[in-house]
Structures are given as structure tokens and as C-alpha cells.
Amino acid sequence: MRKPFYKILYVQVLFAIFVGILLGHYWPDTGVAMKPLGDAFIKLIKMIIGPIIFCTVVSGIAGMRDMKKVGRVGGKALLYFEIVSTFALLLGLIATHALKPGVGFNIDPATLDTKSIAQYVSKAHGQSTVEFFMHIIPDTIFSAFANGDILQILMVSMFFGSALAVVGERARIIHDMVDQVSKVFFHIVHVITKVAPIGAFGAMAFTIGKYGLGSLIPLLKLIGTFYLTAIVFVLVVLGTVARLTGFSIIRFVAYIKEELLIVLGTSSSEAALPHLMEKMEKLGCSKSVVGLVVPTGYSFNLDGTNIYMTMAVIFIAQATNIELTLMQQLTILAVAMVTSKGASGVTGSGFITLAATLAVVPTIPVAGMVLILGIDRFMSECRALTNIVGNGVATVVVSAWEHELDRARLTRVLRGEDEASSLADASAR
């Protein structure tokens, strides 16, 4: 029996976003006061992300038993991430040159007030490759969870899962316990998700109330260029990848619509991480691949952030009349490839990453970030949406490469023919 439409989660979230926009526009002070609702929902999700990743990764690796397979899956995922990330960076660069959203501003960087971006610049710094990998290693096992650092939690989880796999049957009781604890945490996720419309309402009301729809007008061309480029990336680049793997990107996007609407309302792709992992298993991807690819992708496969990085840098150069040589642009691509790996799915992290990129590329003034500060929140939503679609597609692709994709179930679920049975199968797995 179908649910009444008003009880469907994505309908509730969509309605909440609409009401939030109206409240923020007509009563901006009240809209700004709704910020705690959005923040509370994000904190609830972040509270559960660490345990979810730990249990899923540990269970997946321990279930593999073969350490060569763990390395193979991780290697294939990283290879895919780097290839697709490069396409995203290049597409952002090409689109900005083609549509020229920054041409005509004629801004003198010396006249820009940098006080508003000081908090972002202070958090950003150029990070070498060695520093990046050293950061992945936590000071203690517990500090990884206390700080909520996805990469550090992933590191701890991989060591723990590998140890269980090596010990074998003697550790079976621990493996089974982790599986059971995982079910408890996913149940908590389902409970938290019920308040997603409230979180989306609060976050959207705050965004519109603080920044206002009027702040979009001067930079509509940049926003339009970014959204158009992201759509082209999803339909053409990810669409081609999906077609080669044997599924439709349109059907896939429709399949994760609830997660996308939660992300749209909160501007954070982390808000949908637990649900995305569950949906990928339901779709026919193996639990072990989902456990490795999805959490890793949240730091290494941020397609929307990559598009934004090169687009924002070139926009600032155009707006301040700075001519960049081919070598300088290639340097920007290389730097962005590294700095984007430090971004997470949290609201505002893309702007901090942009500051880190500009700090390493002195040709373009960091002060130019002031030009896009007012619209960054509106672009953050598109970044997060593109990121989550990219990570979902990556999971299906790596599962297919590992021959651990149930293609029959994939087809049935995307066509909406196997909702109940596939959910039961996923739970059994």
C-alpha cells in the first residue's frame, strides 16, 4: 500500500525548503533565528557518521578475508577518483573560459575589504603531500572519533577490519557483534532522518534570511555558469560512466532523490552519507565495496568541489583583470587536485579549500574571495549535490569492476520494480 504523499520524506523536505525560502525572504530576522534547527540536524548526523563508517568498513573488510582484495578495491577506487576529479577540474576551467562570468567587473584587489574572509583565510594553509598523509594518522584511536575526521576514522577502521580478517574465526564473535551494532546505528539514522524536514527548513530559512535573494543578482552569471557546468558534468561525464557500466544516470538520480533533497536543504553532503551507504547496498553493490568507497569518496571524490575550485579561481582572475598563462593554469589544476582532498562534505569547507588554493597560487589575490563570499552558500548546495551523485556512481562502478554488482537487482530497483525485496536483501547482506 502506497504512503499518502504528505508522508513521503522527499515531499516533506521539498515543502520545508519552500517554506524556509518564504520565511527567510519575507521575515529575514526570523529566518536567521531558525539557524539552530539546521545546525542541530547536521550535528545529529555528524554524531552518527563515525560509528556508521567504522562498523561498515570493519564489517566489509573482515568479510573479505583476502587482504589483496582490500588493496585492489581501494586502488581501483582511488584510480577512478583521480580520473573523474581531473575531468571535473578541467570542465570547470573550460566552462569559465567559455562563458567568462568574471569579465567586465574590472575590480582593483587593493580596494577590497578582506575582513569578511579573514576567518576562512586563517583556517586555510597550503598543505604538502607529506602533511596531508601525516594528517590521516590520528594521535589516538579515540581522537579520530572525537574530531569527527572521516579520513582518520577510515584509517582506524581499515586497521581494525584487517586485523579481524587476519585473526579469522577466532575473531568471529567480534565481527558478528560489529554487524549487530551497525544495525542499531542505522536504526538511529532512520529516526534522525524523520526530522530532516525541520533541519532543511531551518537551514534554508537562515540562508535566505541572512544573504537574501537580492545578493544573487550581481553574480547571477557565475551562479548560472556553475550550476550549468555541474549539470553538464552529471549528465555527460557521469552519464557516460553510468551508461558504460549499464545503468541510467537519470534513473539513478531519481533513485537517490530523498538524499539529494536533504543535501539541498542542509548544503551538506555528509547529511546523507549514512542513507547513501544503505541505498547503495539496496541497489546491488556489495557491502564490502560500499564500506570502502563511499567514506573514502567523501574526501577523495568531491566532483562538485573540484568544478567550483577552478571556476572560482578563474572567475577571480577575470574579475581582477589578471591574465594567466597556460603554465599557471596547469599549476592551479595541480594545486586544486591536492587541496580539494582536504575538503569534507560540511557546509563552508569548499570556501576554506579555495582559500588554501589561492594561498599556494600567489598570482591571484586571496582578497578576490570577497567577490563570491555572499553567494558561496548558494553555490555550496550545488557542490554538495554533485558530490553525492558522484560518490554514488563511483560505488556502482567499483562494484562492477570487482564483479560484485548484482546487475539484475540494479535494473529492478532503478525501475522501481523491486523496492521491498531489495531492501530485505540488503538488510540480510
From Swiss-Prot:
Name of protein: C4-dicarboxylate transport protein 1
Keywords: Cell inner membrane, Cell membrane, Membrane, Symport, Transmembrane, Transmembrane helix, Transport
Gene from which the chain derives: dctA1
PANTHER family: AEROBIC C4-DICARBOXYLATE TRANSPORT PROTEIN, PROTON/GLUTAMATE-ASPARTATE SYMPORTER
Family under the similarity heading: Belongs to the dicarboxylate/amino acid:cation symporter (DAACS) (TC 2.A.23) family.
Gene Ontology MF, one: malate:proton symporter activity
Superkingdom of this protein's organism: Bacteria
Transmembrane segments: 8-28, 44-64, 77-97, 148-168, 188-208, 222-242, 307-327, 355-375
InterPro entries xrefs: C4_dicarb_transport, Na-dicarboxylate_symporter, Na-dicarboxylate_symporter_CS, Na:dicarbo_symporter_sf
GO BP terms: L-aspartate transmembrane transport
Cited Pfam families: SDF
Role according to the record: Responsible for the transport of dicarboxylates such as succinate, fumarate, and malate from the periplasm across the membrane.
Any one annotated GO CC term: plasma membrane
Localization: Cell inner membrane
Bilayer topology annotation: Multi-pass membrane protein
Native organism: Cupriavidus metallidurans (strain ATCC 43123 / DSM 2839 / NBRC 102507 / CH34)
